[in-house]
Amino acid sequence: MREIKTEIQIAAPPEKIWSIITDFNNWKSWNPIVTQVSGSSSLGSELSVTMCGKDGKAAQKYKPKITNFEAPKSFRWRAKMMAEFLFTNDKTIELEKVGSGTRLIHKEFFSGMMVPLMWGFLDKGVPPMLKSMNDALKAKAEKS
């Protein structure tokens, strides 16, 4: 299993950030990477997710399942390509209260037989996407 991890400090309480990140239907209003998410923000729910490509057009659609949901601390979803043993991606967002603000820890885990073949792309391409998403979330949470 390979992991990519990013962190950001946000000057807003975890509860406020939680309300933004679990309002999946409004991700498109602030998220430059994940342009559409539909589904219920609850344990076991299957979501429909569309990610944006470099050209700003829809690049990838997938259907992750929420495998962990601990309000207002963390959630995790899992998506697989064809079969789990080929390629699985887990996204985890954790919120830690730090003073009057929050540390957001954003992780992506990759496993399966395809990961060694894709790692060069994942290791270079995913961190900037996570940073862009984190920065946009910070701006939204600190603005309102």
Please state what every model-predicted region is.
Residues M1-Q9, E15, V49, V98, ...:
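Hydrophobic-ligand-binding modules of eukaryotic lipid transfer/binding families
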Residues S38, D55-R103, F109-G112:
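Hydrophobic-ligand binding "helix-grip"
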